[in-house]
């Protein structure tokens, strides 16, 4: 977060972990496939590029897994804030989504993706989702907030979302695909009843069954 290129996004760290996890499987599969093809033909007739690709893909998968290991360690130490994961680190070292913040103390996406990515430590995944439920599930309004409290008076400059009225859109309102990620995370943790409840809660149909609700 910031224009100096020093800021880091925690949720994108989880996203990168997931991407590397999926691509390492592809690289490993492709490398093993080429390896089997190598064994099936006479070495004299082997296309040299296939041999190079076999070694390259296996090494690529190993490199990705090493990056994943380092990412997971960093996310579960530097980004863990005691009850949930922070959202981001700004250029100047300030944090978003920290318990210490007056605004944007907690963000939904970092909690959801700790589970979706598979990178969150087992106990921390459950603790962070409990915090999400406590601070971001608004059953009265029927929404799952992106963050809370919204940006309004603090000196933090997170970008364009601060221009939105507090409690609307990304600034403390519902960011719907972020809300869906929270529901997916609940389901992945085995809380099917909660996932169903929250899905029904945010369903637009449930917000327009009567003229008053609409």
Please give the residue ranges for each predicted region.
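Acidic, mature catalytic/reactive cores of soluble proteins
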Residues: 1-214
């Amino acid at each position: 977060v910031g224009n100096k290129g020093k800021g880091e996004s925690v949720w994108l760290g989880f996203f990168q972990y997931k991407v590397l996890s999926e691509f390492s499987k592809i690289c490993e599969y492709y490398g093993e496939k080429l390896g089997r093809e190598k064994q099936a033909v006479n070495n004299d007739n082997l296309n040299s590029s296939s041999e190079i690709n076999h070694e390259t893909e296996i090494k690529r998968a190993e490199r990705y897994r090493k990056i994943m290991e380092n990412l997971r360690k960093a996310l579960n130490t530097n980004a863990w804030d005691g009850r949930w994961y922070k959202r981001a680190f700004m250029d100047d070292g300030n944090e978003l989504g920290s318990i210490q913040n007056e605004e944007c103390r907690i963000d939904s996406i970092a909690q959801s993706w700790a589970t979706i990515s598979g990178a969150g430590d087992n106990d921390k995944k459950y603790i962070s989702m409990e915090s999400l439920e406590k601070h971001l599930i608004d059953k009265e309004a029927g929404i799952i907030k992106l963050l809370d409290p919204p940006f309004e008076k603090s000196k933090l400059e997170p970008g364009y979302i601060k221009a939105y009225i507090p409690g609307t859109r990304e600034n403390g309102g519902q960011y719907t695909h972020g809300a869906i990620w929270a529901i997916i995370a609940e389901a992945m943790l085995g809380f099917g009843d909660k996932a169903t409840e929250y899905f029904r809660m945010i369903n637009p149909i449930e917000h327009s069954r009567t003229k008053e609700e609409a």
